[in-house]
């Protein structure tokens, strides 16, 4: 993969870094939330950029599988956001049984329901579009080893047969902004790697000599790129 192609991929991935937009004008001002364990809560600013339509916002936190609620509450869990207004969602931890030696990943869900106009005929058949988005929330304990900004550089890559083995020896999640082995783009094959995790991706028969990757930082931007010979 050429440097130009890799740069284009990073640009496209990071074009959403400023904020996560739902259709209809609702904008989450962050693409991820870092919950610092040393603080009592975290915040997620939200705005209604629309000119006319108020929205009813419903928010909650769930686990990675999306099937069970996480040990966090969001307040207010349900509220009306007028056109042109902004607000902030407060995320509060409700349990003390989370790992303290590594990051944990959860997801914040925000559902936006447009308010009906008073003039709308309640008996008329109509389609109401409900918009929903889901962003990552990292629970970060205090006193983790190493620097979070350096975690992505600590990843280990090894080739075995027709596979790329990826190891994360750090206590932080690393979210990929790009991954390629020579000219083979693997970005769509992996989203993130958890602390202490090992992942394996298939490689073409030709293998590859060099691995190039980039990560997404706490602010939703790119970390830059790193290139390393494959062992």
UniProtKB/Swiss-Prot annotation:
Cell compartment(s), UniProt: Periplasm
Keyword Signal: yes
Signal peptide interval: 1-23
UniProt-recorded Gene Ontology molecular function terms: protein folding chaperone
Single Gene Ontology BP annotation: chaperone-mediated protein folding
Record Gene3D superfamilies: Immunoglobulins (2.60.40.10)
Recorded phenotype for the gene knockout or disruption: Deletion of the operon under classical laboratory conditions does not result in any major effect on E.coli capacity to form biofilms compared with the wild-type strain.
Induction, per UniProt: Expression is negatively regulated by H-NS and subjected to cAMP receptor protein (CRP)-mediated catabolite repression.
Record-linked SUPFAM superfamilies: PapD-like (SSF49354), Periplasmic chaperone C-domain (SSF49584)
Record Pfam families: PapD_C, PapD_N
Keyword entries, A-Z: Chaperone, Fimbrium biogenesis, Immunoglobulin domain, Periplasm, Signal
Broad class of the protein's primary localization: periplasm
GO cellular component, as recorded: outer membrane-bounded periplasmic space
Family: Belongs to the periplasmic pilus chaperone family.
PANTHER family, A to Z: CHAPERONE PROTEIN FIMC-RELATED, PILUS ASSEMBLY CHAPERONE
Function: Part of the yraHIJK fimbrial operon. Could contribute to adhesion to various surfaces in specific environmental niches. Increases adhesion to eukaryotic T24 bladder epithelial cells in the absence of fim operon.
Misc: The operon is cryptic under classical laboratory conditions, but is functional when constitutively expressed.
Protein name: Probable fimbrial chaperone YraI
